[in-house]
Swiss-Prot record:
Lineage: Viruses, Riboviria, Orthornavirae, Negarnaviricota, Haploviricotina
Matches recorded under InterPro entries: Paramyx_V_Zn-bd, Paramyxo_P/V_N
Protein family membership: Belongs to the paramyxoviruses V protein family.
GO MF entries: metal ion binding
Keywords: Host cytoplasm, Host-virus interaction, Inhibition of host innate immune response by virus, Inhibition of host interferon signaling pathway by virus, Inhibition of host MDA5 by virus, Inhibition of host RLR pathway by virus, Inhibition of host TYK2 by virus, Interferon antiviral system evasion, Metal-binding, Viral immunoevasion, Zinc
Protein name in UniProt: Non-structural protein V
Name of the encoding gene: P/V
Length: 299
């Protein structure tokens, strides 16, 4: 059953493509419609009673849509309406030919004809094809039962004019659903990573525990805390003159800058002592001391 319906669907698609490539003359279409109405009027009346009973049993209500588009001969499926006859369908068809505003909004039922105006073989199955009118660039086709949708029969060659073949796959996931799924996955992964890191920090290994000292306070020492004294730096100055050496020794605070020459500097940080063990007994701490011979220099 599925293969047969797929065959009819493919045939219907081929007929639609042929009508697009070579549109029929409107006069030919009207003549073919008139001939078809005359021949099918008797069959329609015979099927009205059986179709009405079946519609009441299955609660089926299908609208009577006329055909759409130039060059496509069509006929409303009035036999699905139960009590509605062919005369009302003829009136709707005439009104539809004069009104082209419905071409872009309605889903139409198509009866396919060949170029001679005769109905194509298998049209009773092919007329279940629904085509969205106005969608010339990409025609989407629905029809048949679930088995035909899952069949392996090829839907035909791609349209050389750019029409894409019917897409029988599942509908894509909406962007909102995708964004929600991604956020949930990322949130779960981040939470798991944080838990793993917290567990690793709590685990201690013997002999490899890292003890991090506390960050020292940036507060200044209070008055009760005495500042640490830095100390002194021993300075020596040598002057050569006619074979004689003039030597001067003294102490400068550690915070003072090292310069060339005999310079006795003062403490600028307030943490260096006034005297040290080397200069406490040095008489030259206040005055320059001259040593005229190398032998006179104390060790």
């Amino acid at each position: 059953m599925a293969e047969e319906q797929a065959y009819h669907v493919n045939k219907g698609l081929e007929c639609i493509k042929a009508l697009r490539a070579r549109p029929l003359d409107p006069l030919v279409v009207e003549e073919a419609l008139a001939a078809w109405v005359e021949t099918s009027e008797g069959q329609t009346l015979d099927r009205m009673s059986s179709d009405e009973a079946e519609a009441d049993h299955q609660d089926i209500s299908k609208p009577c849509f006329p055909a759409a588009g130039p060059g496509k001969s069509s006929m409303s499926r009035c036999h699905d309406q139960g009590l509605r006859g062919s005369n009302s369908c003829d009136e709707e068809l005439g009104a539809f030919i004069g009104d082209s505003s419905m071409h872009s909004t309605e889903v139409q039922h198509y009866h396919v004809y060949d170029h001679s105006g005769e109905k194509v073989e298998g049209v009773e199955d092919a007329d279940s094809i629904l085509v969205q009118s106005g969608a010339d660039d990409g025609v989407e086709v629905w029809g048949g039962d679930e088995e035909s949708e899952n069949s392996d029969v090829d839907s035909g060659e791609p349209d050389p004019e750019g029409s894409a073949p019917a897409d029988w796959g599942s509908s894509p996931i909406s962007p909102a659903t995708r964004a929600s799924d991604v956020e949930t996955v990322e949130g779960d992964e981040i939470q798991k990573l944080l838990e793993d890191q917290s567990r690793i920090r709590k685990m201690t290994k013997a002999g490899k525990t890292l003890v991090v000292p506390p960050i020292p306070s940036q507060e200044r020492p209070t008055a009760s805390e005495k500042p640490i004294k830095k100390g002194h730096r021993r300075e020596i100055d040598l002057i050569w003159n006619d074979g004689r050496v003039f030597i001067d020794r003294w102490c400068n605070p550690t915070c003072s800058k090292v310069t060339v020459g005999t310079v006795r500097a003062k403490c600028i940080c307030g943490e260096c002592p006034r005297v040290c063990e080397q200069c406490i007994t040095d008489s030259g701490i206040e005055n320059r001391i001259w040593y005229h011979n190398l032998a006179d220099i104390p060790e």
